[in-house]
C-alpha cells in the first residue's frame, strides 16, 4: 500500500452522520459517489467537454470511513483514448480526533467525452 496519495486532490469533505450505513460506518455508496464526482472533475477538465461515467472497476474498500473523518479523493489520468479516459482514484482519510492518515478505498473510473446530444466526441488534447 502506498505511503502517500497518488494523483491530484479533486475532492475534500467531511463524513457526516447522515451518510452512515446500518453499522454506523459511512455507506460505501457515498464514498463511491465522491470518487465519481472527483474523477469526473478531472475528466471534464482534461477533455474540455462534458463527460459521462461508463465504468467503475476494481473497487476495493480497505478500511471503513467513520463519521467525522476528513475524506480526500485523489485522481490521475492513466490513459486517454480517442473518446475515453481511464482514471485511477484513491480515497484517503484523516481520522477524526487521532489525525491518523489512511488509504481507505481505491478504484478505476472510465469516462467518455460527449457532445450536447450525449454522443461520444474525441477528447480534446492541448486545446485542439
Predicted features along the sequence, with ranges:
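Short non-domain terminal segments
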Residues: 25, 59, 107-109
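Short, charge-patterned binding micro-sites
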Residues: 56-64
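HotDog/MaoC-like acyl-thioester-processing domains
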Residues: 3-11, 66-67, 78-128
Amino acid at each position: 500500500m502506498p505511503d502517500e496519495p497518488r494523483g491530484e486532490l479533486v475532492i475534500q469533505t467531511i463524513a457526516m452522520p447522515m451518510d452512515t450505513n446500518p453499522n454506523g460506518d459511512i455507506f460505501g455508496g457515498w464514498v463511491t459517489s465522491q470518487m465519481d464526482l472527483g474523477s469526473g472533475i478531472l475528466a471534464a477538465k482534461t477533455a474540455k467537454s462534458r463527460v459521462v461515467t461508463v465504468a467503475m472497476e476494481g473497487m476495493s474498500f480497505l478500511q471503513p470511513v467513520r463519521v467525522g473523518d476528513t475524506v480526500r479523493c485523489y485522481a490521475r489520468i492513466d490513459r486517454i483514448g480517442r473518446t475515453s479516459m481511464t482514471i485511477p482514484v484513491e480515497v484517503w482519510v484523516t481520522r477524526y480526533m487521532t489525525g491518523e492518515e489512511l488509504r481507505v478505498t481505491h478504484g478505476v473510473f472510465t469516462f467518455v467525452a460527449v457532445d450536447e446530444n450525449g454522443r461520444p466526441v474525441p477528447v480534446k488534447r492541448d486545446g485542439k
